[in-house]
Amino acid sequence: MALKDYVLEKDKVKKFLQEFYQDDESGKKQFKYGNQLVQLAHREQVAMYVDLDDIAEDDPELVDSICENTKRYARLFADAVQELLPQYKEREVVNKDVLDVYIEHRLMMEQRSRDPGAARSPQNQYPPELMRRFELYFQGPSSNKPRVIREVRADSVGKLVTVRGIVTRVSEVKPRMVVATYTCDQCGAETYQPIQSPTFMPLIMCPSQECQTNRSGGRLYLQTRGSKFIKFQEMKMQEHSDQVPVGNIPRSITVLVEGENTRIAQPGDHVSVTGIFLPILRTGFRQMVQGLLSETYLEAHRIVKMSKSEEDESGAGELTREELRQITEEDFYEKLAASIAPEIYGHEDVKKALLLLLVGGVDQSPRGMKIRGNINICLMGDPGVAKSQLLSYIDRLAPRSQYTTGRGSSGVGLTAAVLRDSVSGELTLEGGALVLADQGVCCIDEFDKMAEADRTAIHEVMEQQTISIAKAGILTTLNARCSILAAANPAYGRYNPRRSLEQNIQLPAALLSRFDLLWLIQDRPDRDNDLRLAQHITYVHQHSRQPPAQFEPLDMKLMRRYIAMCREKQPAVPESLADYITAAYVEMRREAWASKDATYTSARTLLAILRLSTALARLRMVDTVEKEDVNEAIRLMEMSKDSLLGDKGQTARTQRPADVIFATVRELVSEGQSVRFSEAEQRCISRGFTPAQFQAALDEYEELNVWQVNTARTRITFV
């Protein structure tokens, strides 16, 4: 491999910066980097970003050289820009800072004291880092796909790499010294020391010619006002949960951020970082013990926060015709729900609720007040009903997820911890499981085993979707926009039908009301059901897959891509449904009060119905919520309540469905009035009755002359 001629390379860089242009909409040439040079010369811009895709159009070999030896070419580009700036300076800089005045004053004083034509002494030569008043960063080529942190190894040292992950820790922004300026106490000469590493050894003895000749032993004193500082921040990145192989610990990497790239990311943000992978020698006692080993870090050039859509992360593109055909078949809602954990038998309604949790509702922000769109679900039940298996499957299916258990989690581990940095000794904030699951799902198993003090830490997350921190002088608010999926056992291990609901659940009402759906899964003896379950389990053990069904379950990757597409939709509730939803909620409140319902029905129940309805509309990829969506949301709400009431909730339906249907229709009208046939039928179906049961009740009460149905079967009129 031939040696590079860096003088020739600098000429190439200058030519590119001066001549590269793009055509705008009107066809005029826009010199992209020429305009940036003008702004840099007039201090209207601080950072210059060089897109390697632009260089690739003219010189692909130069792009390869930059990616292979990025640090050297960054200095080369900076020197080229510094030499070009005087050509683009059209006027004097108006807004001068302290360093500008200092450098101008020193240059003027030196010109007065120096003989005309004499060269400057090399010790007093101003370093280029001091004179450079701009920052230069590279944007990686589009062909450079983001890599997993564990794939960045020793062969990437010195190269430009792009990694993707989640920010776990961010330090405070501090000034880092780039050039140290010293003044001699004997001769008054100034000495400059460029600093390349985070640590340096200050100069003590004056190296000027005068002090060396006179042997006066002048000592140097640091002059802070004449030194140059740059903003500096340290960041810790960790792999996404979907990038970690099963059984492995997530890898992390240190990112050093400088200048204009600081304060972009916070703990919990999902970011893509382009930078130079570099080693750094250990210092102090660690260097003596582990002298041959080096720490590695990423010198950030570009930080991009990932958008809300999961498309960037899961690689979701356009669906093929075959995939669209699979999804848009009849009963696609049931098919998608049954594709969740197909190895687990039954739990159809629970799987539908989990599907809606993955899709989520629509966030609302009326006049700054935020109403969450994420759906929270609690699965409570006897041991051995596959609660943990459902949580584990959702954890694998969701693009962003965190899985934790109640016994092994503290309130600090769920929210955020304040840690002391090992290098600087300052206090930094590290996000917990709820922060890392931002815009995803946080699965908490053994929810009932958590200590009460730790459980109260998630109250704010479940409603406000934020975590407020006031620890060790750090006052801040972190985003925790995640859905909570919790699994718990009843008190004393199993559900006791002889005890009341409060005695069995033993969770506070403030917490229960924050769950949109609270599902009780009981293990009741039933010969037919037990036989089907046993056959299902034995088949799975024999063949290591689910039994053959009427349809083929959808692939996990396809489901993830379809859910990502659904989340891009923002359906709204039309005005025509407002009265219907209001009446349904008022009726639920009346029923709960009349029956002394143990479940807590509040305004959050109405918000839960709206969230479930918008999630169903998202699932159908439409922009408007329809009546069927509201009915299905109410049905899921009723089924979850019935699961809590157990036999009490089913008594009325199993004994006399017709009586319950009559009461339901009667609630829709005032005394002596009529009701639309379709409205009454939909309300009864939303309560869990079949059309056949509705028709039988209609005929029975029509024979009793309680009501009459018109010939067109459009209205029901009470006699």
Swiss-Prot record:
Top enzyme class: hydrolase
TM spans (from-to): none
Reaction equations catalysed: ATP + H2O = ADP + phosphate + H(+)
Residue segments, region Interaction with ATRIP: 577-719
Residues bearing the modification N-acetylalanine: 2
Region described as Interaction with RAD17: spans on this chain: 521-564
GO terms, molecular function: ATP binding; ATP hydrolysis activity; DNA helicase activity; single-stranded DNA binding
Post-translational modification note: O-glycosylated (O-GlcNAcylated), in a cell cycle-dependent manner.
One Pfam family this sequence matches: MCM
Annotated ATP 2 binding sites: 514, 604
EC annotation from Swiss-Prot or TrEMBL: 3.6.4.12
Keywords: Acetylation, ATP-binding, Cell cycle, Chromosome, DNA replication, DNA-binding, Glycoprotein, Helicase, Hydrolase, Isopeptide bond, Nucleotide-binding, Nucleus, Phosphoprotein, Ubl conjugation
Gene Ontology annotations of biological process type: cell population proliferation; DNA damage response; DNA replication; DNA replication initiation; DNA strand elongation involved in DNA replication; double-strand break repair via break-induced replication; regulation of phosphorylation
Stated family: Belongs to the MCM family.
Additional notes on this entry: Early fractionation of eukaryotic MCM proteins yielded a variety of dimeric, trimeric and tetrameric complexes with unclear biological significance. Specifically a MCM467 subcomplex is shown to have in vitro helicase activity which is inhibited by the MCM2 subunit. The MCM2-7 hexamer is the proposed physiological active complex.
Functional note: Acts as a component of the MCM2-7 complex (MCM complex) which is the replicative helicase essential for 'once per cell cycle' DNA replication initiation and elongation in eukaryotic cells. Core component of CDC45-MCM-GINS (CMG) helicase, the molecular machine that unwinds template DNA during replication, and around which the replisome is built.
Name of the protein described by the UniProt record: DNA replication licensing factor MCM7
Organism: Bos taurus
